[in-house]
Amino acid sequence: MRRRTRLILALDVTEESKALRLAADTKDYVDAFKVNYPLVLSRGMGIVDKLAKIGDVICDFKVADIPNTNRLIVDQVFRHHAKGVIVHGFIGEDAVKACVDAARGDVFVVAEMSHPGAETWNAPIADDLAHMAVEVGAAGIVAPATRPERVRLFRTIVGDRLILSPGVGAQGGTPADPIRAGADYIIVGRAIYDAANPRAEAEKITQEAARAAAAPPRR
């Protein structure tokens, strides 16, 4: 996945026509399209193949099963031309390593989620999950744009591995804060696909991200 705009569009929709239209409209401002269960359960894995003809696709399946099942899931992801897959870290090193070993692209481990409930159960083990992601050879981690101070800490743990940061827009995160904190990519969904002009909104967000990336780092 080549970094141009730092924007990943979360296609959290169920209609194939809407997903393909959004992808075509925003592709000039998006580095990858993230698909989740709502779209795939509605349209099947064929939608991943179709989106992959427009741009890079990350399957946000938050894979969370035993090692053998994880291998089977990850194999299917890459058979359908995705470039990456998101997996949960709490399942343990052996199960995450199975995903990495089966992958023919990038594996991103969820270190900490962006919703409020994650602060209760997820955050206390998040640092350990980030360390594990490095140890098993994952391409990077997922860390919350809603808590940029956590992104800053995760950067010290994962070094030059990628950080994907969801929660920009509807959840309250800004495009600039996670980038300044060290995120490589921001993940945005509703703020773009619910906008009157998704292409214009995507352009605006990438401009904000670019300004943040160019600014001197905060200490």
Where are these regions (language model features)?
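C-terminal helical cap(s) of enzyme catalytic domains, especially alpha/beta-barrels
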Residues: 99, 176-219
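Conserved N-terminal beta1-alpha1 strand-loop-helix module at the mouth
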Residues: 1-59, 65-71, 79-82, 126, ...
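Alpha-helix-loop-beta-strand connector modules within alpha/beta enzyme cores
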Residues: 41, 45-61, 101-112, 152-168, ...
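Conserved anion-binding
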Residues: 2-7, 65-148, 160
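Short, acidic/turn-prone active-site loops that include or flank metal/cofactor-
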Residues: 62-65, 90-91, 112-115, 167-171, ...
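Conserved, mostly hydrophobic/aromatic
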Residues: 9, 33, 60, 85, ...
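Short beta->alpha connector loops
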Residues: 13-16, 38-41, 90-93, 145-149, ...
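A C-terminal functional module that forms or caps the active site or interfaces directly
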Residues: 138, 145-192
